[in-house]
Amino acid sequence: MRTIRNAIKRRHRLIVHLLLLVPVIATTFRGSTGHAESFQQNNSAEEHAQALLETLTPEERVGQLFLVTFEGKDVNFETQIYDLITNHHIGGVILEQNSDNFVVPPQTANGTWQLIQELQTTEWSASQSNQIEPETNEEFRPAFIPLFVGISQDGNGPPADQIFNNLTLLPSFMGIGATFETDLARQVGTVAGSELSALGINLLLGPSLDVLETPIEEGTGDLGVRTFGGDPFWVGEMGRAYVSGVHEGSEGGMAVIAKHFPGHGSSDRLPEKEVATVRKSLEQLKQIELAPFYAVTGNAPSELATVDGLLTSHIRYQGFQGNIRETTRPVSMDPQALDQLINLPPFADWIEAGGIMISENLGSEAFRRFEDPSGLNFQARFIARDAFLAGNDLLFVGDEFISTSDEDQYSSIVSTLDLFAQKYRDDPAFQERVDESVLKILTLKYKLNNSTIFTLGSTIPPQENLVDVGNSDQVSRQVSQEAVTLISPSFTDLAETIPVPPDINDKIVFITDERSAQQCFTCPEQQVFPKSGLMDAVLRLYGPLAGGQVVQRNLFTYSFDQLLALLNRAPEFDYTVLESELDQAQWIIFSLANVSSDNPSSQALSRFLAERPDLFRQKNLVVFGFDAPYYLDATEISKLSAYYGIYSKIPQFVDTAARVLFGEIPATRGDLPVSVSGINYDLISATSPDPDQTIELFMDVPEAILGTPDPTQMPELTIGDLIPVRTGVIFDHNGRPVPDGTIVDFVLSAGLTEIATQKETTQDGIARTTFLIEESGTIVINARSDPALESNSLQIDIPPEGIPTIEFVITQFPTETATQEPEPTGVISQTETPPPPPSAGSINLIDWFVAAGVSIIVGAVIYWLTTTFGLIRWGVRSGLLAIIGGLLAYMYIALQLPGSQQLLDVPGAWGVLLITTLGAAIGWGASYGWQRIAESS
C-alpha cells in the first residue's frame, strides 16, 4: 500500500511540473500566430512558385517574361494572340484603346469581361493537351499559368483612360491631389480596383508617382493632370492611399505597378512622345523624384500600401553620377543606373521581398526613335534582351515592337522568344537571371490568385459582378467638390469683382475646348468634353425646372474651334453671330482643357485675351480650368474676373463648376497641388510653415503616466532627467499639416542666453525632442520652424537636488491664428497619486480555443499519468475534473465576474493561459482530495 501511495505522490509531482510548462508552451505558440500566418502566406506562394518553376520548359519560362499588346477583340485559333498564348506561353497582355481591344458602348464592360475570359480560357485549354518540346522533340504537358491582364487607367476619361464607357468615370490624379485628402484618394483607388477586377483585369499600370516640380506653361510635354502634384511628400501620401484602395477594392486580386520610375516630373517631353533628358544627379533624385516611390516600396507602412511593381521609364539623366558631361542611356536600358537605383535601401528591401520591375513599352514611338533615329535598323529582340539584362523582370512590348527586317509585331515577338529560349539553354548566367525573374512573377501570380493551385474558376471573376460596375459616381462628385480651387483673385477680391452670380436676365456665352474620342475603331465618335457640357449643367441645375435662375434663350455655347475661326476671320464660318453675342453678353465663361502646341485650337483663349479685349471689357469673364491650372500667364490671368481650378473634365466636375458659378459651392476646399507662376504661387513655399501662426509647445508626457489627457502637466523631474517636449500640429500656408520631414528648431535658453538648439523633423505635423536637465535654475524652451518663428514658451523652474517638485509656466504670445491654447500653468506635487492606467486585459475567440486546448491537454496528461498506475477509474475522474476546472476558470473571466479584470491585469499577456491552467489544477486537486477521502473511508 505504501508503495502505491508513493507512486501516486510521484505522479502528482510530475503532473504539477507539467502544469507549469503548459502556459509557457501555449503562450509561445499563441504569441507568434499573427506573424506566422502572414509569413506562411507569402512563403506558401513562393514555395508553390518554386515547385511550378521546376516543371517548366525553357520556352515556358522565358514566355512568362513578356507582356504583349494585340490588335482586335478576337482570340480564335487563327489569331496571332492565340498562338502566342498557346504555343509560346507569354506571361500576359496589355489592353489598349489604340489596339481596338474594346467594343462599342453600352456593351464595353461586358465585352471586356468576355475578351478576358477567352484569353484565360485559351491559356487553360493549352494546358489540357501535350505539346512537343522543340529542343528534345519530347512530349510535355504545358502548365496552366494565368495571364497577367493589364491596363493603364489614370482617370479623367480619354486619353488617360483606356475604358471610358460603362465604368465609373474617376477623377484625374491631380484632381485627387488638389483635395489633399488621403481618404478620398483611397476611395477612388477602391472604386478603380473593384471595377477593373470585376472585368478580370489583374494588373494596373498606375498610379503615376511623378513629381511635377516645374510645370511647363506652354503645355508642350509635361504630364499635366496625370500626376498627383508637385510636392514629393504629398504625391507619396496620395499614392500610398490610392494603392491601398486598389488593393482593397480588388480584394488583393490586382497587382499595382507605380510609374514612371524613377520619375518623369522634371521632363519636358511626354514619355510616349520622346525620350527625355533631365539634368539631375542621383542625390537630387533622392530628394524629389524618388521620395514618392520610397513611400510605396520599402517605406510603405503596410502591405496594402506597397506596390507590387515599378514601371521603369525611358528617361535619361545628365550628371547622374555628378559628371555633367556624362549622360545615361534610358534608365530602363541602363544596367549601371538602374542597379544603383534599385539598390538604394528602400528599394533593395522591397526587391528582396518580391517587388517586380517592368520595362516601359519597348515598342513605343519615342523609344524606337531614340534607338533607331534613321528608322532603318531597329533590332527588337536585342532591345528586349538588353532591357531584361538591365534589371527588368517583365518586358512590355507594344504594337510597334517590330524589327526592321520583320513583317509585324508577332514575328518580332516570336524571334525574341526564340532568342531568349536558346540563350537560356546556352548561358548559365542568363538561365539564373531568367529563373530569378520567373520565380518572382509566379509568386505574384499565386498571391493574386489566392490559391495553392491555378484553376480557371479562380482566375475569371463571375459575370454577375458586372452589375456593380459603373455605380460609384458619388466618389467622383465628392472629389470634385473638395478639389475646386479659386486660383485668382483672392476670396476677398472676388466679392468685389463678382458680387452676385448670373441672374435670369443675364446673357451668358459658354466657350468650351471640346474633345471627342472613340472607344474602338468602328465605334461612333463620342463627345467626352462637349461644347454644351457646362451650359447643359447650368440648365439642369438652375434652369426653368430647377428654380428658374436662368432661361435657355439667354444661354449660348460655342467651341474653341469656332472662337479660333472668329480670331482668324475664317471665311467658311459666320463669325459675326459669335462676335455679336460676345459683344452683348454680360458673362463669358471659358471651359479650358489642356493646352498643347499640337492642338492650335487649345490656344484660342490666350489669343482671344490678347487680340480682342474689346469683346470682354466690362464683362464678367470667368475661366474654369478642367485640366492643369498653369496654362495662363500673369498677364492673361489679370484680365479675368475669376479663374478656377477644376482639374478634371468628367461630368461630375462639370456639374461642380456650374455650382461654383452660381455660388452654391464655395471654391475654398481645394488647394493648388502644383506651382502656378501666373499668380506667383510656389508650392514648396505654400507647404512650408505659415509664418502667422504661433507654434504650440507641450510637455510630451504619455497619458498613461499622468492619468489625464492634459499635455501641459508633467511628472516629477530631477537633475539628470530628460524633459520631453513636443509641438502642436504645425500648419502650412493653406492651413494643412506641414509635410513630414519639415525642420523644427527647439531652443533651450537660460535668461537671454541660448544654451542648446536641437533640430528635429515633423511627423504628421508634429515634432518631438528631449532636453537633459543638467543643473538647477529657470530654463525656457521655444520652437521655430522657418518661416514660423514664434511659439509659446515653456518656462521650467528646476530646483536643487533633493527637491523633486518642478513648476513650469507656459507663456502664450498673442496670435490671430485659431489654435487651441494649452493650460497656462501646471504643478505636480509629490503627494499626488496618478490614477491607474486603463486595463489592457481582454479576451477574444482565440483565447477560447486556447483555453479549451489547454484544459483538454492538461486533462489528457493527468488521465494518462493516473492510468499508468492502474487507477483507470480515478484517471477518468481526474482528467474530466481538470477539464471542467479549466473551462470554469475561463468562463469566470469571460463573463467578467468580480475580480476577473484584476486576474487578467496581473499576469499581463499570459493571463488567460495561466488562469485556465490554474483552474485545471484546481479541478485535478479536487479529484485528488476526493480520492484521498475515498481511500480513508
Regions found by a protein language model. Give the residues of each.
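Active-site-adjacent structural elements in enzyme catalytic domains
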Residues: 103-157, 177-200, 204, 233, ...
